[in-house]
Amino acid sequence: MAVPKKRTSTSKKRIRKNIWKRKGYWVALKAFSLAKSLSTGNSKSFFVRQTKINK
């Protein structure tokens, strides 16, 4: 099993953590955008079946 030779510096740790957070931010933004387009009916990639409620 691979063992690190030296301890990772705080700055490098912080940089990696920020990259990880940034990726999560963009994924969440894209998901929110898709949900918004689905709710308004402007989505071109999903077909949503419209159901009408009879009263």
Swiss-Prot record:
A Gene Ontology BP annotation from the UniProt entry: translation
A Pfam match: Ribosomal_L32p
Keywords attached to this entry: Chloroplast, Plastid, Ribonucleoprotein, Ribosomal protein
InterPro entries named among the record's database cross-references: Ribosomal_bL32, Ribosomal_bL32_plant/cyanobact, Ribosomal_zn-bd
SUPFAM superfamilies: Zn-binding ribosomal proteins
Taxonomy, superkingdom: Eukaryota
GO cellular component term, pick one: large ribosomal subunit
Single Gene Ontology MF annotation: structural constituent of ribosome
Location relative to the cell: Plastid, Chloroplast
Protein family according to the UniProt entry: Belongs to the bacterial ribosomal protein bL32 family.
Name of this protein: Large ribosomal subunit protein bL32c
